[in-house]
Amino acid sequence: ACSERGIAVLTLFAFSSENWRRPRPEVEVLMHLFLTTLRREIRRLDVANVRLRFIGERGAFAATLQEDINKAEQRTAGNTGLTLVIAANYGGRWDIAQACQRVAEDVAADRLQPGDITADLLDQYACLADLPEPDLFIRTGGEQRISNFLLWQLAYAELWFTDVLWPDFDGTTLDQALA
């Protein structure tokens, strides 16, 4: 539906860094769902010319999931259609912190001077540095908050909230959000 509407990049919040606080059995179900969905959908996404990217801290995931994530990115790296970004074990605060850590490393290594640090420079260290900032944030399920998602990148995005649950979100609902 996104490609048909001229949308070049879609970022989905699949697993928040805060989700680790859920009960262990629930986290295990989510991890199993994540892995099985990735394995089931990767061929279809590749055939559809979708480029798959993942953002977030991968180190907390099981080795098999990390391997499948890497394989999916490699398999679709040359695709030129929709870029589908999956935020997994991601949090906006984490993204800002990791960007600041990387800037600090470059300052310590004399690759940057403290006076070089600007908002534009920090953009270059964020997870989505090579992609355009989001134009639109859609939150489903009746919640009216951004829940630590793309905090830096959503600064100028339109925010659209709907009571429609994610599994029921369809092209008609997308058209309403885009209107």
Question: Could you tell me what each predicted segment is?
Answer:
Residues 1-179:
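Flexible, compositionally biased loop and terminal segments
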